[in-house]
Amino acid sequence: MKNLTNEQKEFLLSTIRDVPDFPKPGIVFKDITTLLNNASAFTMLMEHLEERYKEKNIDFVAGIESRGFIFGAALATRLGIGFVPVRKKGKLPYTTISEKYALEYGVDEIEIHIDAFRGEGKRVLLIDDLIATGGTAQAAAKLIQKTGQELVEACFIINLKFLNGEEKLKKLTNIYSVLEIA
């Protein structure tokens, strides 16, 4: 598999906009919409992910709400496999299975349809745009495993390494980040 060069990584990083003090003071939000509307960057990223995963015999890509839907659905289409949305509680119309996770001030919950993977033992790739503290990704990984699936890897476009989010996932699955911000 061909890795991205440092020049390619720098190009991708240059297409991501920093938005200071969003959603609250002191946070620098990584806005990927500027990567998405750059056809060269989005194509390069999707080609890289397709190359990485095309030989891994993955059955489904599961994307975390909401930006994980964008990358996950695009990758699933390129791989010719199904896509499963991991949603916030109350957003799916059919019977669901859920997993709770801790927030800074409280608890949140994500869910998938009970029949999302059409049986057990499927090979699943989890994807999201960014890993920060890792709480949502950890809950999504547990949720996938709770349904009897094999979680092949958790993939993130951006890893904010200084927040140590990957520590919560290391015991559950392999982790791959396209871009890392120290």
Swiss-Prot record:
Keywords recorded for this protein, A-Z: Cytoplasm, Glycosyltransferase, Purine salvage, Transferase
Predominant location: cytoplasm
The keyword Nucleotide-binding is assigned to this record: no
Cellular component terms (Gene Ontology): cytoplasm
Metabolic or biological pathway: Purine metabolism; AMP biosynthesis via salvage pathway; AMP from adenine: step 1/1
Gene Ontology terms, MF aspect: adenine binding; adenine phosphoribosyltransferase activity; AMP binding
EC annotation from Swiss-Prot or TrEMBL: 2.4.2.7
Catalytic activity: AMP + diphosphate = 5-phospho-alpha-D-ribose 1-diphosphate + adenine
Gene Ontology biological process terms, A to Z: adenine salvage; AMP salvage; purine ribonucleoside salvage
Subcellular location per the Swiss-Prot or TrEMBL entry: Cytoplasm
Domain of life: Bacteria
Phosphoprotein among keywords: no
Top-level enzyme category: transferase
CDD domains assigned: PRTases_typeI
Subunit details: Homodimer.
Its biological purpose: Catalyzes a salvage reaction resulting in the formation of AMP, that is energically less costly than de novo synthesis.
Annotated family: Belongs to the purine/pyrimidine phosphoribosyltransferase family.
Protein name listed in UniProt: Adenine phosphoribosyltransferase
Gene field: apt
